[in-house]
């Protein structure tokens, strides 16, 4: 069993309190590694380091910062298989998905590097004679990045890239459930020569370490991917210092199948968008609405695909779905299904834990489909974040838009239709930040990953996401 330390100021150190935590393999329930369980004392130490390092890092020309980060991204690619195996063992995702996650982390960083020469300001006309107004973009300072357990490595890359290219320093706190691949970034940073204190990685509890990081006076920005309740706590904590906050939180994405949809294409997209990473993606198909005129035909196609899902060892290339990440999440799956059946839903497939044979250890749950679902049911409104899908009939476009908007979340929506009138109406009528038309979920780096309502604030990716890591400074220059 490997014992990990925290990466602070270019060194590997223990938590001040001497406490440690364990990382569990969700496929086998075996202890994988021991990590540091840091608290507020470690927050004070690492933020002091990051603040000091930022004064030098921001003076490095942006192009040079980007060149160093391209080496960092390439070294991530050089360690692709090792990092992917770590992700499988700590999170339970399929090996091929883990390989993709490593690639995405590297490409997030490479994409951010493309912005090194595009942090453009403005020259604005003044109302006064012989005066110019300059608006410059500058780094915010110290960024605290808190990442979720579902795609910990990709999320680290998503935040490290723009933060460092923009001239900030960063403190990354991965969740204690899946921190191992992220901690390996410290070794990679050492190898490529990222200056001490520019990239720091710490581990510990959300309330103790996370709370101290987000509320500290040295923290200029908090970027977090995780649950809505945690995001709400971060907003409160960061208000003490008026730090800039960027949050990507929960979701309850609807998948809409219109009467004119290509049903085979829609079924394939719906399947991938629900069971990808065991349903543990913020933009997953959480509630599926199918037009009544094509319901029977569509469900026949869709259910055949569901029945062919192979749950199994995530290292097995024949497996289609791995385990849930922990027992708490597994218990949540059981509770949601029980509540749905109590409220009148019909179990069409799955609905229980897998416990026999190879599933004797680990956190396994069947792909689950619920029919006879009404809009008012709990399963339609509470985020599952797992392999459970309620299916609801609808009759008109207006009805399904009302259903889709009937949620406290507003991250993503997927719709399958050939009618561009429907698509254009979504611009004005749908209350969410991302819309996928005739395809499953999965955003791109140059887009903008942005949630409405309780799904977040600030947004990530693309030019709008990169600008989150920059402040503006205005000069009124009189040259009389």
Curated annotation (Swiss-Prot):
EC number: 1.2.1.92
Record's keyword terms, sorted: Carbohydrate metabolism, NAD, NADP, Oxidoreductase
GO biological process assignments: gamma-aminobutyric acid catabolic process
Listed Gene3D superfamilies: Aldehyde Dehydrogenase, Chain A, domain 1, Aldehyde Dehydrogenase, Chain A, domain 2
Binding of NADP(+), residues: 149-150, 173-176, 226-227, 249, 383
PROSITE patterns to which the protein is assigned, alphabetical: ALDEHYDE_DEHYDR_CYS, ALDEHYDE_DEHYDR_GLU
Gene Ontology molecular functions: succinate-semialdehyde dehydrogenase (NAD+) activity
Pfam families in UniProt: Aldedh
Listed GO CC annotations: cytosol
Family affiliation: Belongs to the aldehyde dehydrogenase family.
Known function: Involved in the degradation of 3,6-anhydro-L-galactose, which is the major monomeric sugar of red macroalgae. Catalyzes the oxidation of 3,6-anhydro-L-galactose (AHG) to form 3,6-anhydrogalactonate (AHGA).
Protein name per its UniProtKB record: 3,6-anhydro-alpha-L-galactose dehydrogenase
Organism of provenance: Vibrio sp. (strain EJY3)
Lineage per the UniProt record: Bacteria, Pseudomonadati, Pseudomonadota, Gammaproteobacteria, Vibrionales
Gene name of the encoded protein: Vejahgd
């Amino acid at each position: 069993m490997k014992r990990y330390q925290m990466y602070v100021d270019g060194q590997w150190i223990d938590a001040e309190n001497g406490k440690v935590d364990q990382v569990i393999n969700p496929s086998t329930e075996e202890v994988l590694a021991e990590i540091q369980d840091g608290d507020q004392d470690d927050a004070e130490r690492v933020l002091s380091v990051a603040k000091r390092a930022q004064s030098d890092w921001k003076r490095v020309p942006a192009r040079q910062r980007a060149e160093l980060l391209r080496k960092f991204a390439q070294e991530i690619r050089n360690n692709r298989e090792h990092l992917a195996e770590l992700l499988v063992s700590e999170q339970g995702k399929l090996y091929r998905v883990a390989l993709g996650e490593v690639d995405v982390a590297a490409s997030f960083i490479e994409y951010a590097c493309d912005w090194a020469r595009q942090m453009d300001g403005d020259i604005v006309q003044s109302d006064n004679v012989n005066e110019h107004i300059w608006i410059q973009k500058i780094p915010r300072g110290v960024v605290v990045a808190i990442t979720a357990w579902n795609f910990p490595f990709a999320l680290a890359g998503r935040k490290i890239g723009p933060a460092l290219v923009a001239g900030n320093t960063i403190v990354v706190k991965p969740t204690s459930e899946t921190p191992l691949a992220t901690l390996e970034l410290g070794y990679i940073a050492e190898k490529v020569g990222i200056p001490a204190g520019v990239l720091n990685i710490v581990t510990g509890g959300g309330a103790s370490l996370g709370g101290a990081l987000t509320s500290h006076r040295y923290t200029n920005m908090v970027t977090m991917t995780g649950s809505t309740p945690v995001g709400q706590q971060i907003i409160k904590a960061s208000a003490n210092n008026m730090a800039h906050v960027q949050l990507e939180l929960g979701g309850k994405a609807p998948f809409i199948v219109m009467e004119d949809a290509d049903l085979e294409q829609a079924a394939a997209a719906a399947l991938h968008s629900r069971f990808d990473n065991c349903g543990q993606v913020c933009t997953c198909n959480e509630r599926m609405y199918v037009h009544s005129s094509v319901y029977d035909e569509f469900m026949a196609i869709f259910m055949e695909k569901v029945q062919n899902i192979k749950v199994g060892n995530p290292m097995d290339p024949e497996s289609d779905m791995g385990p849930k990440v922990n027992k708490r999440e597994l218990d949540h799956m059981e509770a949601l299904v029980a509540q749905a059946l109590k409220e009148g839903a019909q179990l069409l497939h799955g609905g229980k834990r897998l416990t026999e044979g190879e599933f004797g250890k680990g956190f396994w749950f069947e792909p689950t489909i619920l029919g006879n679902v009404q809009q008012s049911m709990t399963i339609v409104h509470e985020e599952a974040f797992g392999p459970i899908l309620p299916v609801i009939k609808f009759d008109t476009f207006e009805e399904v838009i009302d259903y889709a908007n009937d949620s406290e979340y507003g991250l993503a929506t997927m719709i399958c239709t050939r009618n561009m009138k429907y698509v254009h109406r979504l611009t004005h009528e749908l209350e969410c930040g991302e819309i996928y038309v005739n395809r499953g979920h999965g955003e791109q780096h140059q887009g903008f990953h942005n949630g409405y309502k309780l799904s977040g604030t600030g947004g990530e990716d693309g030019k709008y996401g990169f600008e989150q890591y920059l402040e503006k400074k205005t000069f009124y220059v009189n040259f009389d």
